[in-house]
Structure formats: C-alpha cells, structure tokens
Amino acid sequence: MTETEPLETGYGPSVPPGDNLTNDFVQETAASFRALAAARGDRSRRVDGVVSMTDAALPLPFWNRAVLEQPCDDAGALLTMLREFYGSAGGPFLLDSGWPLPDLRAHGFVLMGHPPIMLRPAELKLPPAPSELRIVRVTDEATATDQERTLVDGYPAPQLQPFRAVTMMTPKALEATGWHHFVGYVDDRPVAAGSSYVGDRLLRVENIATLDSVRGRGYGLAITAATIAVDLAKPATLVASDLGRPIYEKLGFTSMSRCSYWLGMRSA
C-alpha cells in the first residue's frame, strides 16, 4: 500500500463479488432492473459506478427506478443525472440507495423510508404451502393478468386501481433474464403473488402481495417460499415492508442493514 493508492471501500461495481453482502445486493438489484427494462423495451441509462436508471413510464414508482451503485459523494451531480433522465412525462420514480443519502427534501423528493434489507441463508428447508393454495408460475397472458391484478389489489397500488389491464407483467417482461414470477390460487381465485430474481450470488424476492381478505392464512409466507425455491443454493434477500417483516422472519430472514427510498417527481 502506497500513500497515493486508494483504500478499497467495498462499494461499487468494481468490487469483487462476494466481498460483502450489501454490495452484492445493490449490484444485483441494479442488474435486475436493467434486465427487466431491456426485456420490456423501457428507457434505461447507466452511469457506470454511479447509478442505474430505468423508466417504465408507469404511475407506480417501483418500476421507474434509479438504483445507486455506490454511496453518493456528489448529490448535485446525481440530481442532475436524475432530472435529465426522468425529465419527460410519466409517473413518479424511486431513488433506491443501499446506503444513507443527504436529505433531498429541499430538492423536491419525498422520503419514503428506510426499510430493512433482509437475508436468509442458503439451503434452509421451506415449509409446505396450505393444502388449499395452488401456486403456479406465470407463463402466459392469463397468469400474468392474475398476478398483476393481485399485486395491484393486494399490495395495494392505488395508482393502478381499479385494475383494467396488464401494464407491468407484459409478455416481454416475462422474458427478462433471471426473473421468475408466481401466482397463488384458492378455488381458482388469485389471492397471492410474488417474484424473484436470481443473480450470480443472491436470490432477491420481489412483488409479494396477498389480498387483504385472505391475510393471516399463510398465503403470503407460501408465495414467498415459492419464489425462494427457484434456487435454494443461493442466500435469499429482500427489502421488507412493516407488514411483511414478521412473515419473512418466520421463513428465517434476518435484517442485515437498511436502505433508503426517496420518491422523485417528474416536475422536481
């Protein structure tokens, strides 16, 4: 080590995979949304080592997502990139950071929270689903419609209610590399939905939703387990809501850190 040689931070895409779980989680999250945007044909831009930005132009911000690839040391430059990319018409966007950010409220952003990033060790046994719940992969228009309807009504996503037609789980979205989607039925009624993305080192759970009328019956736990079962050889990760965290803890997840979610508006 010389006096001029920079110390390794452990953050960013240049850090070797496996160096630390938080960085692996962030880099694979960024890669997953780039893959989804590429499959759907959405706008995307990557500033290598800074931020990956994708824009589905949907009213739900989670699908218009900017993922920081390392801690931000120049908020002004980052805000310029975000405004340039998200300056066109469309819904709000989500700034997703695995590390703390400066307070961005003066710049028109709304703090959504600091939800926990949770980790489940590989190879843990999964519990069986309730006998009345039938979980299937999303592979066609019918199952995609059922999954998206369940996401919209179960999460819920008021921006997309009342549900009319698929806008997220399009045929092209189902072809995105690494992504797997599921829907659960009781008596042929869709009641639970979930997805996962399998990266090089981790599996990440996404899009977990259960209809309010059937909560408390183990369906949320079961659909989450189905998304994890795609690759039990990898540790599973997710970002938990307050409602979902107790369910994930029953599956063996523990909190390893917290991320920061900021809501950006196109006019900001």
Predicted regions and their residues:
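Conserved acetyl-CoA-binding loop-helix of GNAT-fold acetyltransferases
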Residues: A75-L82, T210-V230, K250
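Conserved active-site tyrosine of GNAT-family acetyltransferases
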Residues: L104, Y248, F253
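Acyl-donor-binding surface of acyltransferase catalytic domains
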Residues: E69-A142, P156, A240, C259-G264
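Conserved acetyl-CoA binding element of GNAT-fold acetyltransferases
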Residues: L60-Q70, R201-D212
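N-terminal charged segments
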Residues: M1-G87
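A conserved beta-strand-loop-helix scaffold within acyl/acetyltransferase catalytic domains
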Residues: Q159-L211
